[in-house]
Amino acid sequence: MNKQQQTALNMSRFIKSQSLTLLEKLDALDADEQATMCERLHELAEELQNSIQTHFEAQYGIGVEQP
């Protein structure tokens, strides 16, 4: 995997991680509507990360290392 592809995968992991952190903060603030939106954002971030990883694995025929 080249550097740009690794960067894209790392960015997707970061977005997933940060959306979960935001969800926890919104839950603590009892911001239910926003927490629901953020939960969907986190689910989409997870789907995106999995899609990117699968794409690169298929492209190169190798596994992508997990951090």
Task: Walk through the language-model features, giving the residues of each.
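Short, charge-rich amphipathic interface segments used for partner binding and complex assembly
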Residues: 3, 11-65
